[in-house]
């Protein structure tokens, strides 16, 4: 994959972004947190089985909840849909289940926020758009990325050909 600029499909401009992606060849952004709407099972463009290769998949971005935070806050019907689709078995393992789903997708690029690797809740959220104060303050502690975590991350990257 060349150095492309991921086109962020903001909801109000989705049709313009889709055309830009088609015309330019820029990779599209796919945010897993946007995939699980129980009212449209199987058809949502953010579900991994609907991806093309020319995209960048994220569990979430700096503007979203952490994966663990999202899982705890999302509507029950959407959480149950995500459980069935991703294979989540508990809140404790949810973030890693979503990380695995991102890695096994066909997306050319996979980006995982460190907070999700660390299985942190919304206390580690980076930004809450349209709010003042408290944004961009989270910092990873120096000893947070243990050797065990690094090995787990490496194993996932190697297993899915993303090393």
Residue ranges and their predicted role:
Residues 1, 53, 127-128:
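Short loop/turn microsegments at loop-to-beta-strand junctions
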Residues 1, 59, 132-135:
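Short glycine-rich loop/turn motifs that provide flexible caps or phosphate-binding loops at active sites
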Residues 119-163:
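Structured C-terminal cap/extension of enzyme domains
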């Amino acid at each position: 994959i060349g150095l492309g600029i991921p086109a962020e499909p903001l909801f109000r401009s989705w049709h313009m972004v889709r055309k830009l992606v088609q015309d330019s060849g820029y990779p599209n952004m796919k945010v897993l947190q946007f995939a699980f709407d129980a009212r449209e099972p199987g058809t949502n463009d953010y579900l991994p089985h609907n991806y093309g290769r020319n995209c960048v998949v994220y569990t979430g971005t700096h503007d979203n909840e952490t994966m663990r935070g999202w899982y705890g806050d999302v509507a029950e019907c959407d959480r149950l849909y995500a459980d069935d689709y991703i294979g989540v078995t508990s809140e404790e393992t949810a973030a890693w289940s979503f990380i695995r789903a991102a890695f096994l997708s066909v997306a050319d690029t996979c980006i995982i926020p460190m907070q999700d690797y660390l299985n942190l809740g919304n206390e580690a959220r980076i930004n809450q758009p349209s709010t003042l104060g408290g944004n961009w303050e989270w910092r990873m502690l120096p000893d947070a990325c243990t050797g065990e975590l690094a090995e787990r991350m490496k194993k996932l990257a190697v297993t899915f050909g993303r090393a």
